[in-house]
Design a protein with these regions (language model features):
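Short consensus segments that form the blades of beta-propeller domains
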Residues: 51-55, 82-89, 128-131
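Structural motif
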Residues: 84-95, 133-140
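Beta-propeller blade termini
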Residues: 58-67, 113-124
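Sec-dependent signal peptide cleavage junction
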Residues: 1-5
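Acidic/hydrophobic-patterned starts of short beta strands in beta-sheet-rich repeat architectures
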Residues: 67-80, 121-127
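Acidic, small-residue rich beta-repeat scaffolds with periodic aromatic anchors
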Residues: 6-31, 127-227
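Extracellular C-terminal loop/segment signatures of secreted glycoproteins
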Residues: 88-118, 147-151
Length: 227
C-alpha cells in the first residue's frame, strides 16, 4: 500500500508549486501575504487592488507548462481573459516560477506597465517601459538552470530632439551599451504590436478552484508525448 501511495504521490515540483499557488489564493482571499513570494507579486497585487475578491479568484489563473524544454514544467500565474467551453484562456502572465536545484525559483513577472507573454516557440516577450521616451521589447528564453537567456532587446531612448531605437543582445536597456538602429519609432511600435498579436493563449485553471482541484484538470500539456 505504501508503494502504491508513493507512486500516486504528486511530483516534488508539483507539491512545491502548490505552496506558491496556495499563497496567492490566501492573499487574494483575505490579504494574507506572509507566504507570498517576494518576487513575482507585482501583477498579483495590482489585481487585488482593482478587482473584487470574487472577480480576482475567477480571473486569476494558474497552470503548469514546460517552457524551458527540460521535461519539468514551470508554474505560470496569469490573467484569464476569456472562457471557451470548459476552458479558461489568457495571454497575460503575471508570474513564472521554475523548479531547479530542488527548489522553486522565480523567473519573471508581468504587470500593467510591463506585459509578459509567451510565444509559440516558448520564448518570453516583455513589452514595457517607464514612459513615452523609454519603451522596451525584450525577447528571452528560459534555460534549464532557471536563468533567462537573452535573445534580443529593443528600446527607445532620447537622442538630440527625438527618439532613437536601440538594439542590445545582452538585455541591458542602456544606450551606451547598445547599437543604434535605423528603425523608426513607428516601426518599433509595429514590431511590439506584432509580437503581442502572435503571442499564444495559455489555458489556465481559475484560482477559485485551487482548493478543491489543485493541478487536477490540467491536460498535462507539460508532459512529453511519450510520458
Amino acid at each position: 500500500p505504501k508503494t502504491e501511495a508513493a507512486a500516486k504521490a504528486a511530483p516534488v515540483y508539483e507539491q512545491e508549486y502548490a505552496k506558491v499557488v496556495d499563497s496567492v489564493y490566501e492573499f487574494i482571499s483575505d490579504g494574507t501575504s506572509d507566504n507570498l513570494p517576494e518576487q513575482g507579486r507585482t501583477g498579483i497585487c495590482e489585481v487585488r487592488n482593482f478587482a473584487s475578491r470574487e472577480a480576482a479568484l475567477q480571473q486569476l489563473g494558474y497552470t503548469l507548462q514546460d517552457i524551458s524544454g527540460d521535461g519539468v514544467p514551470e508554474l505560470l500565474i496569469g490573467w484569464i481573459s476569456q472562457k471557451r467551453g470548459v476552458g479558461h484562456y489568457g495571454k497575460e502572465i503575471y508570474a513564472i516560477y521554475t523548479f531547479a536545484d530542488d527548489r522553486v525559483k522565480y523567473v519573471a513577472e508581468g504587470w500593467s506597465r510591463s506585459s509578459l507573454q509567451l510565444m509559440a516557440n516558448d520564448n518570453l516577450v516583455t513589452r514595457g517601459g517607464t514612459g513615452i521616451s523609454h519603451q522596451v521589447l525584450a525577447v528571452e528564453h528560459l534555460q534549464p538552470d532557471g536563468s533567462l537567456g537573452c535573445y534580443e532587446l529593443y528600446f527607445t531612448w532620447p537622442k538630440d530632439d527625438g527618439l532613437c531605437v536601440y538594439r542590445n543582445m545582452n538585455c541591458r536597456s542602456e544606450a551606451d551599451a547598445a547599437q543604434e538602429t535605423d528603425m523608426t519609432v513607428e516601426e518599433f511600435n509595429e514590431m511590439r504590436s506584432e509580437y503581442a498579436n502572435n503571442s499564444v493563449e495559455i489555458e489556465y485553471l481559475p484560482l477559485k478552484d485551487f482548493k478543491k482541484q489543485g493541478f487536477k484538470g490540467l491536460m498535462r500539456q507539460y508532459l512529453s508525448a511519450g510520458g
